[in-house]
Amino acid sequence: MQDLRIVLVIVGALAIAALVLHGLWTNQRNKRAQQKNTAPKAVAAKRSSESRDVDGFDADGIGKVRVVPRNGSPVRDNDPVISSVPQFSAGDEDDVLPGQDAISAESQQEPFEEAQQESFRGDWKDVYVINISAREGSYIYGRDLKHALRILGFRFGEMDIYHRHLEMDGQGEVLFSLINMVKPGTFEPSQMDRMMTPGVSLFMQLPGIGRGLAHFDLMLKAADKLASEVDGILLDTSHQPLSEYYLTQCRDELKAYDHQ
């Protein structure tokens, strides 16, 4: 009797193992059949996708964020908070589609002055930035920064950053602002004496038309004075030494903005 039970147990185990093996074999066979059916479709889809990429139909045109303002590497504590703002030209036109050549010649003609204005639109950025970096191996110390900001008329305010208003007493519109290069970019006035940072960034959002260039020149003067007070170095948005080429480019863009 005992021997029979042992035999039944062995047979049962073998039966279960056979069922499991059969199920696995069936499953693998179905997967291979499915892969054979879907492989041609996948290849065709891939070729179609590659064709679209070559023709440019899938391009979304979105560039890097620059604050807005041109800066995908891993986030570090000293990564700049302000990046770059992509430039978009309102004069850009979509590709001509079939059938659009039927538009009348009259509707395609524009006065020369209007076309000339169109060429200037969108050639400026939404935000202009001047970085002030500590010298290599050093930091900008909060106590020096606080002293310089007081001299230059900056006031701590919205978004927990410093702002330079039209009036030295903090009245009027904001001309430009200052943030910490260390994320999240804010300051704590009560901790300024113990703070140190690799750098700060001055940024100016576009003001009303006609005031862009004037505000930028004021920001440049403030940046130069601030760098002198904290023994810093002026850098552009690419974190290269501030050059006449960069300043000329900014001024030309703002002139176009002011005269649109």
Swiss-Prot record:
Q: Name one GO cellular component term.
A: plasma membrane
SUPFAM superfamilies noted in UniProt? Cell-division protein ZipA, C-terminal domain
Q: Which residues lie on this side of the membrane: Periplasmic?
A: 1-5
The record ties this protein, via Pfam families, to: ZipA_C
| UniProt keyword Cell division, yes or no | yes
Q: Where is this region: Disordered?
A: 31-98
- Organism superkingdom: Bacteria
**Keywords, A to Z?**
Cell cycle, Cell division, Cell inner membrane, Cell membrane, Membrane, Transmembrane, Transmembrane helix
InterPro entries documented for this protein: Cell_div_ZipA, ZipA_FtsZ-bd_C, ZipA_FtsZ-bd_C_sf
Please give the start and end residues of each transmembrane region.
Answer: 6-26
Q: Which residues lie on this side of the membrane: Cytoplasmic?
A: 27-260
The family note in this entry says: Belongs to the ZipA family.
Give the multimer and partner information. Answer: Interacts with FtsZ via their C-terminal domains.
Report the protein's function. Answer: Essential cell division protein that stabilizes the FtsZ protofilaments by cross-linking them and that serves as a cytoplasmic membrane anchor for the Z ring. Also required for the recruitment to the septal ring of downstream cell division proteins.
Can you say what this protein is called? Answer: Cell division protein ZipA
